Amino acid sequence: AGTTHEPFSWEGKYFHFRYANPWPRPYQQPHPPVWITGTSPDNIPWVADRRYTLATFLTPWDVAEQLFNLYRARCRERGYPEPGPEKFAYLAMVYTGETDERAQEEGKKLLWYLHRRRPVEFFVPPGYVPPAARSRVYKAGPGPLRPRESWEELQAGGLVICGSPRTVLKRARELNERLGVGHFLMMNQAGFMTAQETR
């Protein structure tokens, strides 16, 4: 509907509209930028074919690198222009302290978010992943968001970036050089952190 410039009718499976005329029109044409989060290789061709931005959240760098490379390969395969960094986004949990030592101690509060348990239906709602993958997750039952990796493993994998301002900047540059992302999102609050610790 957002890309149609004239009134139209819609005869869908569940809804029927004899006359639809979206107004006001989106300012950005043909539509605002679309970001798709994904960690499944099955979704990458669909995202790349539409030239949407691919975002990975709390994903190890090696997995994100594989996904971004699949996107780039799909673009080459289809003859699309080489995707620039603006087509890739990455989110990590980031904690910056006055010193590396202090940041390492205070930043461990981020583990609450990474290790907390929650109902599986919130993690994999219907329509987000292929049915076969969803079935595997449901059969496994509720569990932590991620396996209980150690603090050091989470940092080595890139899910957590923690340290002094200089250390965090160095790791952010490493992330950019390795993954070629144009959007680096930082989650810097979780669980029991105080307001001061999140500033």
Regions found by a protein language model. Give the residues of each.
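Hydrophobic faces of well-ordered beta-strands that scaffold small-molecule active sites
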Residues: 34-37, 52-56, 86-93, 175, ...
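Short, well-ordered beta-to-alpha junction loops that form the rim of enzyme active sites
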Residues: 12-13, 39, 186-189
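A conserved active-site cap/scaffold subdomain adjacent to cofactor or substrate pockets
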Residues: 39-63, 67-68, 72
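Glycine- and acidic
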Residues: 52-53, 153-158, 186-192
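Glycine-rich, proline-tolerant flexible connector loops at the mouths of alpha/beta enzymes
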Residues: 58-61, 186-197
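An alpha-helical appendage that flanks or caps ligand/catalytic pockets
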Residues: 1-25, 62-181
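A local structural motif
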Residues: 26-33
